[in-house]
């Protein structure tokens, strides 16, 4: 308790903040409890047998007592590193979680995972490591949990790939597990009073090179866009995944929408030990929570919120980890019946902090349950159902305009569209909010890597008024490698005022912060000889979101001629972790998993 007071003071929080109501629901009495003596059924494999005396000697050396040897051990995995605002505070949060777990009569064991800052690496070769870091996080947590024989897991992620990484590890190990989201950043503010976020910084480059802002204005934006700790503030990838994971029931209510520097985030951590103990006593495991219905709910909420296309990749991969086969066509079926309601960035004007101020994710789930859009009957990590979790949560204020009523949606169907056609026979993912139109025809300009397009834009080769389909290829899971995100190009297009004139196609991915007429995840990728590798400058490209078609409009004979002439380029990496990734990774339509899709 004394240590908790010190941390609260260090973070500038009033001592009472530690005791605020975080609306953690009381444990249900409907499930059968196990006695405390059986809660260490995993760790007892090394703490009890006389034949494991060396294991016990090592544990005594870490500070465990004789009494501790009969208690459950909880692995607390933090994706902490100092070089990223999304993650820089997670070590402090994990210390609060550690103390909470200890107070609950359990043995906390902290360990760390690797991470990549998508915002820092974006537009550089470093971005090739981003998606691959999801696998490293999953592999690392799985490794420690299994090798150390921990009974339960608490994971604290912050940046984009962290969330699916920790969930995949939970699915693989299938021990009582819970996620504590690090929370999102609060908005920045320019000298002119303009609300800013990280995407403002990305778009400032396009504004600068087209003369819309000068150097002083550009620097003001990048200096003030990110005011402190927390993940990027819009409905970008981190917040999309955190919200989806809360929807599925793998966090306590409110975890996904509570800002990183809000006192209630500390309270969430203070209370997590009792939640873990409930999961252990009731034997609530990830595969009990992560059901097909839970994934259905998550896909609905992603479409309601206008969330990141990365949700397609990551939810497929998480489902794979618990033995559920989720497909890109499942996303299309959900999108067809789900309205797009949220006026959130990148396509709207509000941030996650604004949603938090009107009740956050629990208020959203309560609203969607009331409207019959999601199913609230599934069990969650609290031991209660989603419906029970949010029953006492306040409704949205009557005058809020962040979440539209069903009678007035931004778009009557979802923004995530699965497109196929002669350019993407294995599928692709479009982010079509309706603002950019539903059909685009234009002339192809092809680039074999991201920077080649940026250089072309700087030379003024992309003209306003001309309908251009920019194709950035050899950026897929194997070709990139790592399927880097094209936020730098998409933000430059929007910043340059070319959003109505340019569509962007790629076998890479898009950041959750991207918006415009965007089609990514094209399968087969260029490195595997997909039709995207065969497109040439001047080809006519047709994209029809209503018909869900993306076509390379050239004669079949010409396409076959080009196919025979095409030769696969060498892999960009011949040694190291990315070489291993290229060897193992599945295609985008199967989630880019590296342990073989089910």
From Swiss-Prot:
GO terms for molecular function: 2 iron, 2 sulfur cluster binding; dihydroxy-acid dehydratase activity; metal ion binding. It is an enzyme of class 4 (lyase). Pathway: Amino-acid biosynthesis; L-isoleucine biosynthesis; L-isoleucine from 2-oxobutanoate: step 3/4; Amino-acid biosynthesis; L-valine biosynthesis; L-valine from pyruvate: step 3/4. It catalyses: (2R)-2,3-dihydroxy-3-methylbutanoate = 3-methyl-2-oxobutanoate + H2O; (2R,3R)-2,3-dihydroxy-3-methylpentanoate = (S)-3-methyl-2-oxopentanoate + H2O. InterPro entries: DHAD_IlvD/Edd, Dihydro-acid_dehy_C, DihydroxyA_deHydtase, DiOHA_6PGluconate_deHydtase_CS, ILV_EDD_C, ILV_EDD_N, IlvD/EDD_N. GO terms for cellular component: mitochondrion. Binds 1 [2Fe-2S] cluster per subunit. Residues 1-111 form a transit peptide. Pfam families: ILV_EDD_C (PF24877), ILVD_EDD_N (PF00920). Residues 40-50 have a biased composition (Polar residues). Its main location: mitochondrion. DHAD activity is not inhibited by the dihydroxyacid dehydratase inhibitor aspterric acid (AA). The active site is at residue 511. One of its GO terms (biological process) is L-valine biosynthetic process. Keywords: 2Fe-2S, Amino-acid biosynthesis, Branched-chain amino acid biosynthesis, Iron, Iron-sulfur, Lyase, Magnesium, Metal-binding, Mitochondrion, Transit peptide. While most of the residues in the catalytic chamber are conserved when compared to the housekeeping DHAD, the hydrophobic region at the entrance to the reactive chamber in astD is more constricted as a result of two amino acid substitutions (V496L and I177L). Narrowing of the entrance could therefore sterically exclude the bulkier aspterric acid (AA) from binding in the active site, while the smaller, natural substrates are still able to enter the chamber. This is Dihydroxy-acid dehydratase astD, mitochondrial. It comes from Aspergillus terreus (strain NIH 2624 / FGSC A1156).
């Amino acid at each position: 308790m004394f240590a908790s007071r010190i941390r609260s003071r260090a973070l500038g929080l009033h001592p009472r903040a530690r005791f605020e109501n975080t609306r953690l629901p009381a444990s249900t009495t409907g499930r059968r409890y196990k006695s405390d003596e059986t809660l260490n059924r995993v760790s007892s494999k090394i703490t009890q047998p006389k034949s494991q005396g060396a294991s016990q000697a090592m544990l005594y050396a870490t500070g465990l007592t004789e009494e501790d040897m009969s208690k459950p051990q909880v692995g607390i995995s933090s994706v902490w590193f100092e070089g990223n605002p999304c993650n820089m505070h997670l070590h402090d949060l994990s210390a609060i979680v550690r103390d909470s777990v200890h107070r609950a009569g359990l043995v906390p064991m902290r360990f760390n995972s690797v991470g990549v800052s998508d915002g820092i690496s974006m537009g550089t070769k470093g971005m090739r490591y981003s998606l691959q870091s999801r696998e490293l996080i999953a592999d690392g947590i799985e490794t420690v949990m299994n090798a150390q024989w921990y009974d339960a897991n608490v994971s604290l992620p912050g940046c984009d790939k962290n969330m699916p990484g920790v969930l995949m590890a939970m699915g693989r190990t299938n021990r009582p597990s819970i996620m504590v989201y690090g929370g999102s950043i609060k908005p920045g503010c320019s000298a002119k009073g303009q609300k800013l976020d990280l995407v403002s910084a990305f778009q400032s480059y396009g504004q600068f090179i087209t003369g819309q802002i000068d150097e002083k204005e550009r620097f003001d934006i990048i200096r003030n866009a990110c005011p402190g700790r927390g993940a990027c503030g819009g409905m970008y990838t981190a917040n999309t995944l955190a919200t989806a994971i809360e929807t599925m029931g793998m966090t306590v209510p409110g975890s996904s929408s509570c800002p990183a520097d809000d006192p209630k985030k500390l309270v969430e951590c203070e209370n997590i030990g009792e939640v873990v103990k409930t999961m252990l006593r009731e034997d609530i495991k990830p595969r009990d929570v992560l059901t097909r219905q839970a994934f259905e709910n998550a896909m609905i909420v992603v479409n309601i919120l206008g969330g990141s296309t990365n949700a397609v990749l990551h939810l497929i991969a998480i489902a794979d980890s618990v033995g559920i086969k989720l497909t890109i066509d499942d996303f299309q079926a959900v999108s067809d019946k789900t309205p797009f309601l949220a006026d959130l960035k990148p396509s709207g004007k509000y941030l996650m902090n604004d949603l938090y101020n009107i009740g956050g994710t629990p208020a959203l789930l309560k609203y969607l349950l009331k409207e019959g859009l999601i199913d609230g009957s599934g069990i969650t990590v609290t031991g209660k159902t989603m419906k029970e979790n949010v029953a006492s949560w306040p409704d949205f204020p009557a005058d809020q305009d962040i979440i539209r009523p069903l009678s007035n949606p931004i778009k009557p169907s979802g923004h995530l569209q699965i497109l196929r056609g002669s350019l993407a026979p294995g599928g692709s993912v479009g982010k079509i909010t309706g603002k950019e139109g539903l059909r685009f025809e234009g002339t192809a300009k092809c680039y074999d890597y991201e920077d080649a397009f940026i250089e072309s834009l700087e030379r003024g080769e992309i003209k306003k008024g001309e309908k251009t389909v920019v194709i950035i290829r050899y950026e897929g899971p194997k070709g990139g490698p790592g399927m880097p995100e094209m936020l730098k190009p998409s933000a430059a297009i929007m910043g340059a005022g070319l959003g109505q004139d340019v569509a962007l196609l790629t076998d890479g991915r898009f950041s959750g912060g991207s918006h415009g007429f965007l089609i990514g995840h094209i399968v087969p990728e260029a490195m595997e000889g997909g039709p995207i590798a065969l497109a040439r400058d001047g080809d006519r490209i047709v994209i029809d979101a209503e018909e869900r078609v993306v076509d390379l409009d050239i004669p079949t004979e010409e396409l076959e001629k080009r196919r025979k002439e095409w030769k696969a380029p060498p892999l960009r990496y011949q040694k190291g972790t990315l070489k291993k990734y290229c060897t193992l990774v599945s295609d985008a339509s199967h989630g880019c998993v590296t342990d073989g899709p089910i």
